[in-house]
Amino acid sequence: MSEAIRLTQYSHGAGCGCKISPKVLEVILAGSGAQNLDPKLWVGNASRDDAAVYALDEERGVVSTTDFFMPIVDDPFDFGRIAATNAISDIYAMGGDPLMAIAILGWPVNVLAAEVAREVIAGGRKVCEEAGIPLAGGHSIDAPEPIFGLAVTGVVEKRFMKRNDTAEAGCRLYLTKPLGIGILTTAEKKARLRAEDVGVARDWMCTLNRPGARFGRLAGVKAMTDVTGFGLLGHLVEMADGSKLTARVEYAAVPRLASAEYYLEQGCVPGGTLRNFDSYGERIAPLPEVQKLLLCDPQTSGGLLVAVAPEGEAEFLAVAAELGLQLAPIGELVERQSLAVQVL
């Protein structure tokens, strides 16, 4: 049954490319920072961080996050896996460990069979098992387009908690997954994906950001976030602005999927790419079109963006290598200039 279904044809958006643009989100969230007055709320929405953290006691906090979206791939089981991997990532990005998840499902019951939704949930449950947590329940509604995701609860020690706005001048920047996921999934939706590229983006999207829990324990890691729908530049702007610094990025050093630029030449540009640039482009130094299209590419279940102090770099790279990650710096953070990000 599922082989004949193309889930991406039932939605107007795909994955984290469904996100409301940063510019519109600023209007929606204007004034909401007042919620941070609770002293037990260690991390709220003031910094647009990956998750909220609320104190359990003086040493530990509960981490809470939710993430859901429309299909980014056609296969129902893979859609569930990707959505779950993406949602759990926010816990890891805070330096925490996930405890349990609750499913969020919107389904066009008069258009797509219930058995297809069951496959989606099975994919989500599979990833929860890989993360060592239960899929403990959920909520579903009849919706015009398929939607799936998780609300995830985790725990973090305060001394290990990582934010996206605490980087320091001199920190080196690292990215744990290549860019181009939005580009390749757009090629798939347009039926232009070459045979040798089938499954490439999917496999990255289904890779848990579990290393974040280890990175959180490193004193040299000063800030961390995951790269999702706002693209690398969007999350760099958040980190740089929040930390009152400027990020300098070496374009040639940024990891990208091998065929990403080929598909850009074929016109496989996600709709969210230009919306992203329109939202934060004025805070970035001018850059060539191809760089803009790659660096603003909306990532679904993208990698961790990590700011590492020079004195902690050797330990960080050793831990990364132990976890199977061969990383190289993509740039650094310097004292604040007129712009948030410069691409070299």
Curated annotation (Swiss-Prot):
Q: Which residue positions hold the site described Important for catalytic activity?
A: K19
What's the name of the protein?
A: Selenide, water dikinase
**Gene3D superfamilies in alphabetical order:** PurM-like C-terminal domain, PurM-like, N-terminal domain
Quote the cofactor binding remark: Binds 1 Mg(2+) ion per monomer.
* Entry binding sites for Mg(2+): D50, D90, D226
Does the record's keyword annotation contain Hydrolase? Answer: no
Reaction catalyzed: hydrogenselenide + ATP + H2O = selenophosphate + AMP + phosphate + 2 H(+)
Which HAMAP family does this one have?
SelD (MF_00625)
* Any single GO BP term: selenocysteine biosynthetic process
Keyword Cell membrane (UniProt):
no
What residues form the catalytic site here?
C16
Q: What are its cofactors?
A: Mg(2+)
Record function comment: Synthesizes selenophosphate from selenide and ATP.
